């Protein structure tokens, strides 16, 4: 077997492989003998049919099949011998082939990029320094009260904290538009659900009031046909309701399944907030470390890996919205391509960190991660036992641990500082 390697643009490689004719003929003849031995032919006893007849009937099809097998086998032998690492399946194309002659074919594919990590000492990470304070717990308890609130008609004007039920009809240049009309629409004032200026027009109004307001749709509004448009809304206030908050007592506590009365609920709420806070802090640090890693290391990405990741994201999108899995390929590629490329880049770079640092999943870290995750459930012991009895779940958790160890390795070389921040400020930050 003769092999030549041609480097194309980027990560593309082309192998030209020559396979001796004898290899092809041996494979074809072996299969024809197998057919002659095991198939029945009219007028012949089993295994007694002449080989020329078998070759005439099946030679072409067998030769075609065996060519594919031979190309696949010799491609694998070639990349193993030359230590080539393909990033996806090759595309085979025969260059020269005639019966009794050597087979010359090409295999076109992409390789994994050679990654040399750099700039880890230039990665900047700001660790949030935050704790759950008594006032944070009190605010969360107040949120729970609001979630359990009841509403009742009141002879009051609409203002923040009340709920106005309205009818409205919207128009642009005198024409009604889709989604611009509603009856008995409940609007909790002060929540910012409507476009800017809409709630302001209703404030101070009472049940039975009619009004007309003029507002502008934001330039970044989700509906393309409404972006930046000036609109007029005719509004009727049907009723205004006041919110009645429940008392913070044992009856209220039982709705949340907490033990130990009001103090028990406070303890449980604080515990949940601290667990959520710890995860958020970890995610913020990880996000900065990965962003810095990507910024400092510009690498080529095999399109084959992006294609694979696009398919994964398509399937996840279909599952998330309850669609038919068969419809996944119909989702436009451009919806996922940028995210897919990012995930491939991050995977390759973290993989190189793991390789360079010679990291292996730490058993104690795996155990700690499982216990941390299980603590959010009613029976943590049962959850831990489930993980420990499921090898696939354990492997998933080992991968999580390995990724965290890679992040720790980045942080060990990065420029890390600390910044004090409030609980709500941190929890309400949008991902970068």
Swiss-Prot record:
Gene3D superfamilies, alphabetized: 3.10.50.40, Trigger factor ribosome-binding domain, Trigger factor, C-terminal domain
One function term, GO molecular function aspect: peptidyl-prolyl cis-trans isomerase activity
Reaction equations catalysed: [protein]-peptidylproline (omega=180) = [protein]-peptidylproline (omega=0)
Residue ranges of domain PPIase FKBP-type in the record: 161-246
Gene it is expressed from: tig
Cross-referenced NCBIfam families: tig
Family matches, as HAMAP family: Trigger_factor_Tig
PROSITE patterns tied to this protein: FKBP_PPIASE
Reported function: Involved in protein export. Acts as a chaperone by maintaining the newly synthesized protein in an open conformation. Functions as a peptidyl-prolyl cis-trans isomerase.
Identification of the protein by name: Trigger factor
């Amino acid at each position: 077997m003769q092999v030549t390697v041609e480097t194309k643009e980027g990560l593309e490689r082309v192998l030209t492989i020559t396979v001796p004719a004898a290899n092809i003929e041996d494979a074809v003849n072996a299969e024809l003998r197998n057919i002659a031995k095991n198939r029945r032919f009219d007028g012949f006893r089993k295994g007694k049919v002449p080989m020329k007849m078998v070759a005439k009937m099946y030679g072409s099809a067998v030769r075609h099949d065996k060519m594919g097998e031979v190309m696949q086998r010799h491609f694998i032998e070639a990349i193993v011998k030359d230590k080539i690492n393909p990033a996806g399946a090759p595309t085979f194309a025969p260059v020269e082939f005639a019966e009794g002659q050597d087979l010359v074919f090409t295999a076109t594919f992409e390789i994994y990029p050679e990654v040399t990590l750099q700039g880890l000492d230039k990665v900047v990470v700001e660790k949030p320094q935050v704790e759950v304070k008594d006032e944070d717990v009190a605010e969360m308890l107040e949120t729970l009260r609001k979630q359990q609130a009841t509403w009742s008609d009141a002879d009051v004007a609409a203002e923040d904290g009340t709920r106005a039920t309205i009818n409205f009809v919207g128009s642009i240049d005198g024409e009604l538009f889709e989604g611009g009309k509603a009856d008995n629409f409940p609007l909790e004032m002060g929540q910012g659900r409507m476009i800017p200026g809409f709630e302001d027009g209703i404030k101070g109004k009472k049940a039975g009031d009619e009004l007309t307001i003029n507002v502008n749709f934001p330039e970044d509004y989700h509906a393309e046909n409404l972006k930046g448009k000036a609109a007029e809304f005719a509004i009727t206030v049907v009723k205004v309701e006041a919110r009645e908050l429940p008392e913070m007592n044992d009856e209220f506590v039982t709705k949340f399944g907490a033990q130990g009365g009001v103090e028990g609920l406070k303890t449980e709420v604080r515990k949940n907030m601290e667990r959520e806070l710890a995860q958020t802090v970890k995610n913020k640090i990880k996000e900065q470390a990965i962003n810095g890693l990507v910024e400092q290391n510009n690498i080529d990405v095999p399109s084959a890996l992006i294609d694979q990741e696009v398919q994964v994201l398509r399937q996840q999108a279909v599952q998330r919205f309850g669609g038919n899995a068969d419809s996944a390929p119909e989702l436009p590629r451009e919806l996922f391509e940028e995210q897919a490329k990012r995930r491939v880049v991050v995977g390759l770079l973290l993989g190189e960190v793991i390789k360079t640092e010679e990291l292996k999943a730490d058993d104690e870290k795996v155990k700690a991660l499982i216990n941390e995750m299980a603590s959010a459930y009613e029976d943590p012991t049962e959850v831990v036992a489930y993980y420990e009895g499921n090898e696939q779940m354990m492997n998933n958790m080992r991968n999580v641990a390995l990724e965290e160890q890679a992040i720790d390795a980045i942080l060990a070389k990065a420029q890390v500082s600390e910044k004090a921040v409030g609980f709500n400020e941190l929890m309400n930050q949008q991902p970068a």
